[in-house]
């Protein structure tokens, strides 16, 4: 009986030191592996989140500009800007004496309906100041059009009254006499003319955002009304946009095909310029955007060379993530 008990006690002495060390080593390896997997997953999440933010910014900025461009030269009931009375003429920026929106971006900025798409090449050429300055490697894109939905006449707002063949700019709360009386088509019920708000937007890049100081941003000068007076507001559109570039596809022989691409502000489509080509039409718009993240990324070095449009931005050699996108947009109203 005593021998059995002594034998049992000798076999209940616990783990040896070697066994304990092996167990601790295995546990340590498992913990280290779990931490590495966590860190890698966290790093992948941060990278994916950064990529998604840059892509979202690029998509939003492109969609905003594209929406305007696709509706350029829409004047309500027709798409012929040269048929709108009150538009800027060669030598007469404001023939009917309409109120020039303040702060003025130029005498023809709001009224040059003969050029529904315009701009400047790698320079800020508007008379109104750029909020926070303007980036030197970026174009200015100006789009003129009318609102899609008809509205009621509004005192102080620049509007267009139009039919299928003519139009007129006005700013009173009364429809111009040339379009009275407004009658409805007996079959379709459509009024003989419609009132639409004049819309003018000039997109540009500022080197610093008001929302996120130090970050470049896409901004626009937009025509609106305040206290019964037409004014120009400066709005921030998308922080993170470093450059916008525009080229216009023009048709010079009236065959509804693009013959060549020119930079914004080119004289070939400016009726007041010596190199103007009579009958030229802008058929397409090609847009480039360079978008960057709003914060730096650890371990990232951007060594790519960016060449949007006709500008070479070179290598940035910093820790911001960037994306360059481009799109060619058909201008539907140029064909009608």
Predicted regions and their residues:
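A generic, residue-level signal for flexible/boundary positions that often mark functional hotspots
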Residues: 45-48, 231, 323
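Aliphatic-rich helix starts adjacent to a transmembrane/signal segment
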Residues: 2-8, 13-18, 22-74
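N-terminal pilin/flagellin-like segments and related low-complexity appendage regions
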Residues: 61-284, 288, 294-321, 336
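Flexible, small/polar- and glycine-enriched "cap/hinge" segments at structural transition points
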Residues: 331-332
């Amino acid at each position: 009986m005593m021998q059995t008990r002594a034998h049992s006690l000798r076999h209940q002495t616990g783990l040896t030191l070697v066994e304990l060390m092996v167990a601790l080593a295995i546990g340590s390896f498992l913990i280290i592996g779990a931490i590495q997997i966590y860190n890698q997953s966290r790093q992948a999440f941060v990278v994916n989140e950064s990529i998604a933010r840059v892509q979202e910014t690029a998509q939003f900025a492109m969609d905003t500009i594209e929406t305007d461009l696709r509706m350029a030269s829409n004047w309500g009931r027709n798409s012929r800007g040269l048929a709108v009375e009150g538009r800027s003429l060669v030598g007469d920026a404001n023939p009917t004496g309409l109120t020039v929106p303040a702060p003025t971006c130029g005498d023809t900025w709001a009224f040059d309906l003969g050029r529904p798409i315009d701009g400047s090449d790698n320079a800020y050429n508007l008379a109104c100041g750029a909020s926070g300055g303007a980036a030197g490697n970026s174009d200015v894109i100006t789009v003129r059009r009318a609102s899609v939905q008809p509205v009621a006449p509004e005192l102080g707002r620049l509007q267009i009254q139009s039919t299928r063949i003519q139009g007129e700019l006005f700013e009173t709360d009364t429809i111009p006499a040339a379009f009275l009386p407004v009658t409805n088509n007996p079959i379709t019920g459509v009024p003989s003319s419609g009132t639409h708000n004049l819309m003018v937007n000039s997109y540009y890049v500022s080197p610093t955002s008001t929302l996120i100081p130090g970050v470049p941003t896409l901004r626009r000068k937009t025509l609106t009304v305040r206290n019964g007076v037409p004014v120009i507001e400066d709005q921030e559109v998308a922080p993170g946009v470093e450059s916008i570039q525009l080229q216009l596809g023009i048709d010079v022989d009236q065959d509804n095909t693009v013959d060549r691409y020119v930079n914004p502000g080119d004289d070939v489509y400016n009726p007041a310029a010596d190199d103007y080509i009579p009958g030229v039409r802008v058929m397409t718009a090609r847009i480039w955007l360079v978008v960057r993240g709003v914060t730096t990324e650890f371990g990232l070095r951007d060594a790519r060379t960016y060449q949007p449009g006709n500008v070479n931005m070179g290598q940035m050699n910093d820790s911001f993530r960037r994306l360059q996108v481009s799109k060619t947009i058909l201008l539907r109203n140029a064909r009608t």
